[in-house]
Amino acid sequence: ENPFPTALDDCFETLNWVVQNANKLSIDLGAIGIGGDSAGGNLASAIALRARDEKLTPLAFQLLIYPCNDISMNYKSASDYAEGYGLSTTAMKWFWQQYLPKEEFKSNPYAVPALARNLRGTPPAIVIAAEFDPLTDDARNYHKKLIADSVPAVYREYPGQIHGFFNLGGVTDDAQTLYSDIATEINAILGRHK
């Protein structure tokens, strides 16, 4: 709805408020994570970077569900699944243009997390992808970058699924499986920190 950096700033201010009010809210500071799907996955990735850079209380995890972190879209899934699978590559390019109307935004790692020099020091990551999604390789490549930068990260790709299946809990059993898998992974991460 609003171009960069409005959504990023809103998310960061919200996270900062939660951290500052954790005692009043009876929240365990060691269990705060960030997550989102699609554009929300981009924001979650960017918030993880910004929280690290601004030395906010360390986040416990980042949940990235088919994130859009690479504006170039120069990868195989963007051409293989460009049309006919829900989200199209053409639509994705249009969304990027709306979010980043100024050229200087396109080189900012808080807008395009794949451009971050390194991801070291960001929280453990759970990266989710759908098989038939223009963004499958985006998620896969970001996971590889996390691992290369020594960030604990798991990658799960759901065969036969399309972008947006996270929101199909009453429609497909794979969405229910995804919810269970996410809970299992978050519990494993939080269990390691106790």
Task: List the model feature ranges, each with a label.
Residues 1-194:
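Alpha/beta-hydrolase superfamily serine-hydrolase fold, recognizing
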